[in-house]
């Protein structure tokens, strides 16, 4: 039984789904998808549970959420292994994901009070109050690259605000979704408050098509995000929060420490096997001998990156991609870029047929035109050379996406210029593009999405503001507006 609906584990009535380790092929999880009828049941359960959950005090909801945080801590090793085995990422990185899940809970609690709590200001004849109310029933779509951490960034603030939820993990990470749901079960959530439906496209379409949804919170690809936006167009009564991908630029200016700059670039482009939405996809490198030296060093160090299994010792920097198909898509993208005129500096290689272990690739695209503006979700870095900083910014902004952007430079003035001109929601200076702070917004503009699903800013879209003018008594004003007559004289 792999679906959690209204406080019970039930068997899906849809197609059988089998999840394998993307490197070893070992079967990790299997179960049936939720069909449309079961998705509807989950929605009705969430709707029935909403009034009581929303009427609980914030403190009562907080108790359950903090209990979940404690369960994450006590089950950290087990959940780390599940995420690592299912995604292919090394154990060390999966452990940081679980830690991030834990840390964001305390931040989400604080964010609720600071950003969406209650405020009151006194007026001469009463008071003006601001309160926040939950939307109702929300659907949460989770991605596969961080199957615990990223859905957690929606679920925790949504529950704290008083919403009830239908959670659909990525069809590529059902085991992680299952494991997290069982911890929520132990945390003592009332039936119907959080429901789990497993499945792929058909389940997702049934979920997003529900008329009784009050909103949808999504993290994933731009293509799917666009489909959801079209599907919910003309429905302003539903909140839609989209965090999508990026075709992210990293600009390398003059650098004193080449190895430090290479390290930052590798962290930006190849961590998580290039499967972070903030990963650098486009590298802009200043022309000249220093740029040549940097590029040669980047290729040399990247060539030493050997993907390994989740439990290899010593631990590898990167593991496998989410699937062999995903790895092959990166190879195909590289081949297409080469055919368009790109100059390969480091060819990506599948280490073994039938696995998702893929080495990083680097290809120079200077002077090549007509390139597609698409995110290649994997360890493939494209390189352009530029002559001046204004040109670098123009090239960096030449994308429909706007998630992250970075600059490596000793000059604060250039960073200030980038801050003014960059089209990105995250702009870093001498820091990896993949770094983020839970107290800062996480998200972008354009094809990268709309709202900001971080622990701090997610509170904004999980509740709506209610303004009130209040007085504990009613009296006739001493001064009336023109034309009003409350005298005792009888008008004839």
Curated annotation (Swiss-Prot):
One GO molecular-function entry: succinylglutamate-semialdehyde dehydrogenase activity
Gene3D superfamilies xrefs: Aldehyde Dehydrogenase, Chain A, domain 1, Aldehyde Dehydrogenase, Chain A, domain 2
Pathway recorded for this protein: Amino-acid degradation; L-arginine degradation via AST pathway; L-glutamate and succinate from L-arginine: step 4/5
GO BP annotation list: arginine catabolic process to glutamate; arginine catabolic process to succinate
Active site (UniProt): 243, 277
Entry binding sites for NAD(+): 220-225
Residues of the signal peptide: none
Keywords attached to this entry: Arginine metabolism, NAD, Oxidoreductase
Top EC class of this enzyme: oxidoreductase
Catalysed conversion reaction: N-succinyl-L-glutamate 5-semialdehyde + NAD(+) + H2O = N-succinyl-L-glutamate + NADH + 2 H(+)
Enzyme Commission numbers on file: 1.2.1.71
Disulfide bonds: none
Family affiliation: Belongs to the aldehyde dehydrogenase family. AstD subfamily.
NCBIfam families the record matches: arg_catab_astD, PRK09457.1
Functional summary from the UniProt entry: Catalyzes the NAD-dependent reduction of succinylglutamate semialdehyde into succinylglutamate.
Name of the featured protein: N-succinylglutamate 5-semialdehyde dehydrogenase
Gene expressing this chain: astD
């Amino acid at each position: 039984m792999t679906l959690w609906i209204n406080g019970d584990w039930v068997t899906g009535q849809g197609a059988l789904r089998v999840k394998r380790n993307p490197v070893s092929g070992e079967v990790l999880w299997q179960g049936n998808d939720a069909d449309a009828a079961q998705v509807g049941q989950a929605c009705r359960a969430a709707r029935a549970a909403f009034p009581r959950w929303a009427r609980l005090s914030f403190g009562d909801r907080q108790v359950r959420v903090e209990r979940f945080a404690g369960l994450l801590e006590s089950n950290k090793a087990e959940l780390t292994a599940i995420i690592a085995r299912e995604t292919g990422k090394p154990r060390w990185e999966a452990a940081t994901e679980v830690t991030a899940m834990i840390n964001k809970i305390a931040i989400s609690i604080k964010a609720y009070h600071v950003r969406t709590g209650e405020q009151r200001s006194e007026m001469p004849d009463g008071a003006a109050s601001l309160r926040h109310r939950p939307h109702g029933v929300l659907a949460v779509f989770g991605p596969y690259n961080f199957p615990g951490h990223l859905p957690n960034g929606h679920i925790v603030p949504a529950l704290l605000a008083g919403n009830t939820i239908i959670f659909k993990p990525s069809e590529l990470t059902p085991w992680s979704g299952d494991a997290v749901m069982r911890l929520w079960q132990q945390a003592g959530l009332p039936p119907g408050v959080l429901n789990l439906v497993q499945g792929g496209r058909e389940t997702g379409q049934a979920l997003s098509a529900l008329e009784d949804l009050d909103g949808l919170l999504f993290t994933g690809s731009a293509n799917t995000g666009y489909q959801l936006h079209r599907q919910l167009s003309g429905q302003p009564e539903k909140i839609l929060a989209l965090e999508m991908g990026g075709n992210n630029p990293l600009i390398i200016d003059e650098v004193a420490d080449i190895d430090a700059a290479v390290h930052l670039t590798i962290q930006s482009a190849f961590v998580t096997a290039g499967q972070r939405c903030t990963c650098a996809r486009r590298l802009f490198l200043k022309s000249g001998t220093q740029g040549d030296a940097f590029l040669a060093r980047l290729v040399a160090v990247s060539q030493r990156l050997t993907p390994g299994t989740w439990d290899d010792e010593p631990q590898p920097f990167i593991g496998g991609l989410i699937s062999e198909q995903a790895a092959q898509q990166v190879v195909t993208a590289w081949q297409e870029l080469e055919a368009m005129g790109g100059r390969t500096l480091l060819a990506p290689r599948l280490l073994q047929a039938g696995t998702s272990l893929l080495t990083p690739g680097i290809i120079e695209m200077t002077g090549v035109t007509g390139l597609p503006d698409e995110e290649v979700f994997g360890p493939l870095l494209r390189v352009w050379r530029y002559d001046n900083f204004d040109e670098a910014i123009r090239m960096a902004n030449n994308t429909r996406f706007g998630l992250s952007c970075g600059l490596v430079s000793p000059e604060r003035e250039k960073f200030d210029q980038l801050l003014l001109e960059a089209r990105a929601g995250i702009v870093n200076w001498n820091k990896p593009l993949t770094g983020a702070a839970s107290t800062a917004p996480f998200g972008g503009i354009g094809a990268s999405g709309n709202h900001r699903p971080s622990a701090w800013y997610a509170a904004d879209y999980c509740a709506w503001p209610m303004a009130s003018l209040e007085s504990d008594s009613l009296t006739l004003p001493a001064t009336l507006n023109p034309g009003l007559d409350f005298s005792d004289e009888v008008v004839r």
